[in-house]
Amino acid sequence: MAKTALKNKAAAKPKFKVRAYTRCQVCGRPHSVYRKFGLCRICLREKAHRGELPGVTKSSW
């Protein structure tokens, strides 16, 4: 889990646009965040398995 200070820092509007970065809305993880959902890969997988994300299905090929 991310520290509260880092979550707040990411939420604040930066002075320069290039300093902005995405964090997971659930756990605050800064890496591998899917912009479409606002979730990291781990939280995305958990929510998809529980059926909390409509339209997301497990792929099979």
Swiss-Prot record:
Binds 1 zinc ion per subunit. PANTHER family: 30S RIBOSOMAL PROTEIN S14, SMALL RIBOSOMAL SUBUNIT PROTEIN US14M. It comes from Bifidobacterium adolescentis (strain ATCC 15703 / DSM 20083 / NCTC 11814 / E194a). GO terms for biological process: translation. Its cofactor is Zn(2+). GO terms for cellular component: cytoplasm; small ribosomal subunit. The gene is rpsZ. PROSITE patterns: RIBOSOMAL_S14. One of its GO terms (molecular function) is rRNA binding. Keywords: Metal-binding, Ribonucleoprotein, Ribosomal protein, RNA-binding, rRNA-binding, Zinc. Binds 16S rRNA, required for the assembly of 30S particles and may also be responsible for determining the conformation of the 16S rRNA at the A site. Belongs to the universal ribosomal protein uS14 family. Zinc-binding uS14 subfamily. InterPro entries: Ribosomal_uS14, Ribosomal_uS14_bact, Ribosomal_uS14_CS, Ribosomal_uS14_sf. This is Small ribosomal subunit protein uS14. Zn(2+) binds at residues 24, 27, 40, 43. SUPFAM superfamilies: Glucocorticoid receptor-like (DNA-binding domain) (SSF57716). Part of the 30S ribosomal subunit. Contacts proteins S3 and S10.
